[in-house]
């Protein structure tokens, strides 16, 4: 990839671009209409959407690769890349057509450039840079997790600062959102993300062979079967019980579950790949332990924020977002914590929790309003498969060593 030019060259180009574009009649219409095209290709969803400055979705399109990856047992980066390559032009064109917007009317194009699968990010970035250069439009590089965190502000007025828990198949983090591009990172996953854990457990249980789960993702299958399961039949240990910070770990839990599955397979005299009779109970116990772990770390984050004045004293808010936030059991677990600590829990609707072009466009709108991170089309941008969010405060949280009072996690299915 071409490296970013020097700051001086970028500044010169930006000033030159603003004087030539925003001052010209052809760009005046686009600037006044304030329309943003958002493009998302960070993993296995090809998404595009056009939003106006109020957050109204004028048009959107989404191509999901879920069915393909279900057959292969997980996301294969080269397969995801090829599917993005085959669909991105159509998806963007559909979003524009459904919004009745011509590229000349756009104020900017916002695209996910970090973090995510390198091969997937590359497709979205390459397409976007060609598009903005062809139509002479400003480019807004987007941090995928920032977009998830800010989605709720598109749906209702949520003032900064607020606490956000972002949980998905690839990420898990706790942060204080203090502004559109101002975050304090309180905790992150040390190994794998909760969505990844649920997917791997589902694959180990061969849930794709279950008649109710053949078309569901791993996380969806776990949630469905858990409704009829008895979580008390398997007592999995909640991770990191003696580590008093806000970071997450799910690999150890997955190992516990794998050992329990192997034991039951031996007891029932079946081979791996055959459905266990107790599959609902294992699903329920796994889901409960994931939910409890997320809830406890979030509880500590709330106490840390209160002790350090990081949240407003009146109507403090926890935002829960990301693909795993669609899980209703996990939402209920978090609601127990927010009720006990006096916070308001806000969750975007499930369709906005998973990856989509709408959230990227909205992040672009927020940045456009504040004039932050807006680049002229000629600037080369690199994608970043790994990219932390905000200022890392995890060491300070660990040093505080906040111990939790017990809160009973009685969560109805």
Give short role names for the model-derived ranges.
Residues 314-334:
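Glycine-rich phosphate-binding loops at beta-strand->alpha-helix junctions
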